[in-house]
């Protein structure tokens, strides 16, 4: 069954995306302080390029020291709206039903479900609020909504005790589709540093997603290292765009997602009328449960992205993922 697919979607919201760029200070080239915006927009600008406010904000802590070294720090607070689309393959280890019976006869071992290829697709929209607590450290919280589906190739066998297992033709080569939706929330932090126009960042976050067809929540941990370079872009008078910054990077995303899912059979729709009738008969009391164990075919994928810093207060970001997990990410951010 395709219940396992939800893991993928968790991971997608768990990616509270951010990126940063550090610039060598106008003075003291040996400085180790680097700062950036919440998204890859976090780019440091030399002090002479941007006028600092007359009364520097309290955050980030040690911000005065960074400014004294010639760095222009981004506004401390940010609001980010993100959209992410993920498609990935999943391997299912086992699917088990329990709580089934025909009268007083238990039928927990009646069905044997063999699962082939499984493909999951999900879309997640999130809103993230962040704050720079240190010139090189950003923390954030996020909340969002995930919606998607999975499709699995399955074959169902029926166990007949000492008679062995039969595989009815009408229960083989089925396409099992599972639709799901849920709310995702979480928190994370990003560390950044750089030399000249080169920058490196490390993002880590933890999320929980509550799905409409699962018991409890699904937990996910995501770790994303990135390395990139910052370019200065000319202004475009015809579009009233000032000179900006363009950050490009490569990276990788690691996902560790809870791999066991449980729920009620009443929330599932079987892929064929024949199988649905058999499950309904064995689950006449409505106590049937499912338990799915699975794992991602690959916890890592490759990322390529870019961020355009339009003004000091606004930037847009996009990122693509490929290899075992295909993903598309786009975000707009306002800093204040």
What do the PLM-derived regions correspond to, one by one?
Residues 1-57:
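Cleavable N-terminal export/targeting peptides
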Residues 35-178:
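Transmembrane beta-barrel domains of Gram-negative outer membranes and organellar outer membranes
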Residues 67-77, 131-136, 193-200, 232-246, ...:
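Short loop/turn motifs that connect adjacent beta-strands in outer-membrane beta-barrel proteins
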Residues 70, 81, 127-135, 141, ...:
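Residues on the lipid-exposed face of transmembrane beta-strands in outer-membrane beta-barrel proteins
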Residues 75, 121-125, 179-185, 215-223, ...:
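Residues that define the transmembrane beta-barrel architecture of outer-membrane proteins
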Residues 83-89, 143-149, 193-197, 204-210, ...:
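Transmembrane beta-strands of outer-membrane beta-barrel pores
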Residues 247-336:
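Outer membrane beta-barrel transmembrane domains
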């Amino acid at each position: 069954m395709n219940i396992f697919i939800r893991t993928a979607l968790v991971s997608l919201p768990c990616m509270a995306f951010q990126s940063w760029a550090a610039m060598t200070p106008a003075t003291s080239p040996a400085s180790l302080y680097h700062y950036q915006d919440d998204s890859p927009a976090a780019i440091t600008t030399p002090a002479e390029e941007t006028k600092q406010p007359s009364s520097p904000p309290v955050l980030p802590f040690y911000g005065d020291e960074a400014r004294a070294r010639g760095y222009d720090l981004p506004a401390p607070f940010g609001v980010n709206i993100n959209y992410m689309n993920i498609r990935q393959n999943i391997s299912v280890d086992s699917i088990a039903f329990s709580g089934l019976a025909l009268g007083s006869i238990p039928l927990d071992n009646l069905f044997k479900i063999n699962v082939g290829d499984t493909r999951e697709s999900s879309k997640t929209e999130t809103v993230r609020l962040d704050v720079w607590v240190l010139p090189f450290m950003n923390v954030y919280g996020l909340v969002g909504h995930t919606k998607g589906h999975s499709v699995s190739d399955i074959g169902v066998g029926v166990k007949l005790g000492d008679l062995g297992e039969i595989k009815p033709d009408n229960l083989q080569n089925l396409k099992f589709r599972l639709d799901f939706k849920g709310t995702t929330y979480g928190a994370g932090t990003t560390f950044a540093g750089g030399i000249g126009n080169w920058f490196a960042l490390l993002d880590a976050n933890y999320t929980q997603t509550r799905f409409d067809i699962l018991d409890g929540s699904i937990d996910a941990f995501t770790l994303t290292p990135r390395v990139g370079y910052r370019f200065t872009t000319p202004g475009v008078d015809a579009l009233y765009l000032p000179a900006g910054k363009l950050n490009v990077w490569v990276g990788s995303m690691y996902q560790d997602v809870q791999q066991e899912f449980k729920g009620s059979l009443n929330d599932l729709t079987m892929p064929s009328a024949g199988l649905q009738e058999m499950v309904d008969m064995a689950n006449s009391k409505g106590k049937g449960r499912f338990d799915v164990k699975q794992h991602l075919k690959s916890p890592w994928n490759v990322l390529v992205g870019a961020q355009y810093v339009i003004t000091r207060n606004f930037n847009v970001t996009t990122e693509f993922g490929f290899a075992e997990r295909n993903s598309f990410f786009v975000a707009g951010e306002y800093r204040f």
